[in-house]
Amino acid sequence: MIIEFIHGDILDQPGEGLVCSGNVYLNMSGGVNGALLVRGGEALQIQLHQYLQDEGLKFVPPGFVMEIGPEPFAFRSIVYSVAIDGWYDSNIELAAETLTSALSIIESRGCTSVNIPALATGYGKLSKQDFGVALRRVLSAREWGFELVNVVERNAYGLEEIQDGYRGEQE
């Protein structure tokens, strides 16, 4: 498995699967999901809100993941991933649990490449370095079926922090 750390726009990176960061209210308000919404993902937002309505919920629990779309996007699988609580707090364990669940869905769809953002680090209060620690734990915990994992960050300094956390974690 090749792991690439990329400075850029996650939606512009080739990949079959996409982990999409989200919140407990399933609003596509910023980060990756905000970018999806701006680029034609209104149907994804409707799908998320329909889930809440169908289930009689106002919000979902931290760690919730849900496959959405992927139309109109070229990804084979997009997984909306809630790695924060209602106050936007998170921790390494929650980020790792959420990422594991999201990657498991994407892997089950036969995807051999996946694009991953730094979950819980935008509006969420997890540091980029702590996300790197969570990422390392997830990717080293089992044999994943991915040939390529793209970890994508728009901010160059943030990308360095993710890499520091990823490389600094000792098992």
What is each residue range found by the language model?
Residues 1-171:
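Macrodomain-like recognition of ADP-ribose-binding/processing modules
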